[in-house]
Each structure stands twice: as structure tokens, then as C-alpha cells.
Amino acid sequence: MNNRFKFRFWCSSENRFITDSVIHGDGKISVKTGICGRDYCHDVVIQQYTGLTDSKDKEICEGDILIIDYDTFGNVIGRVLYETDQGAYILQWKRTGPNQNYINLNCDVAFESVIIGNIFETPLLLK
């Protein structure tokens, strides 16, 4: 069993994911660049890997947008986030009415889902 934590980093000031990065003890994240060795990105959003993969074996991270054929509601498009009250990752979608607008993201749900984007590069998928 692999107990390593995996993260990905979105640099808001550059509108891109940082692929080669190091977190320092002071909380700064440095990025390797070809020009001056290392440069700092100050507006970083850190997203954790959930430990789950979708039906195409892609790693699911916080902020990913998934589509799943959910029995009760049909095709659902939602975003992955960590819900502190649940103590779990959930798939949350936009829904009005008295019914819940999320499901717990477990192995069965992940296996049935497909990553179609993320909240930074394809936010319109959630509209």
C-alpha cells in the first residue's frame, strides 16, 4: 500500500498547473524555469489527490470536474471537494430543491466516473 500524499499546484498568476515544484519549510513554492533556475509563484492553490482513479484510470484530485451516470438523477456533472463535516471527498453538483446535491466519492462512484475537466481550466462545465 502506498501511503504517500500527492498534490498538484495551480498558479493563479500564470493560469497554469505547476508540474515541477518544491514546497519549502516557509510555505513558499518554487518552480523550476529554464531562465533563472527557480522562481516563486505566490498565488498557488494546492489540490490533493483523492487516492481514487476514474474509469479511464486517471487520478482524481480536488477541483476535478467529473461526469457520472447517477441512478437517482441521471447524468451528473460535479466538482470534487473535501467536505470536512463528512470527513470525505464528495462530488458536488448544482441542484435546487430539497434533495442533496452531492454524493460521497468512494471507489464505486470513482470507477463509474470520467474526469472531464477542472475548476480552473474548464469552469464553464459547471454552469
Each language-model region and where it sits:
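Secondary-structure transition motif
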Residues: 1-127
